[in-house]
Amino acid sequence: MITIEDLKPTPGSNKKYKRLGRGQGSGKGKTAGKGHKGQKSRGTGKVRAWMEGGQTPLHRRLPKFGFKNFTKKFYAVVNLETLEEKFDSNAVVTPEVLIEKGIIDKIYDGVKILARGEITKPLTVKAHKFSEKAKEKIEKVGGKIEVI
């Protein structure tokens, strides 16, 4: 059985710390293992990750491109298959009802209805935008569309 007194560190795992810059006799005196001159021998001695010496840095060699369109609208998207699953016949679907049922978390700049999946129930759908196919499918089964 092993007891706590029997435990010893693995050989080589406890290496004694070498004090630097304490005279030539120590083996790490004078320059303390930093060599002669240069940025890395100085006080802070740090070279930033993006520093490339005199070479033009990568972020300046690469061309600029793109921008953030601040007028872009972001719509909460709902597919017909979701409406089919979550609503009964002749129900009125509004953005507020979609939030209540947990289908969308926010209205953002509006709600857009897309046509993925099939719909068999006639629903009254009120939204900010509809895809052409979604309009066709909703009206085909006797539903109504209202653009808010």
Swiss-Prot record:
Keywords of this entry: Ribonucleoprotein, Ribosomal protein, RNA-binding, rRNA-binding
Signal peptide positions (record): none
Pfam families on file: Ribosomal_L27A (PF00828)
Transmembrane intervals: none
PROSITE patterns xrefs: RIBOSOMAL_L15
Highest rank taxon of the organism: Bacteria
BP GO annotations: translation
Disordered: annotated span: 1-46
Biased composition range(s): Basic residues: 31-45
GO CC list: cytosolic large ribosomal subunit
Gene Ontology MF terms: rRNA binding; structural constituent of ribosome
SUPFAM superfamilies named among the record's database cross-references: Ribosomal proteins L15p and L18e
NCBIfam families reported in the protein's UniProt record: rplO_bact (TIGR01071)
Quaternary structure and interacting proteins, as annotated: Part of the 50S ribosomal subunit.
Similarity comment text for this entry: Belongs to the universal ribosomal protein uL15 family.
HAMAP family named in the record: Ribosomal_uL15
Function: Binds to the 23S rRNA.
Name listed for the protein in its UniProt record: Large ribosomal subunit protein uL15
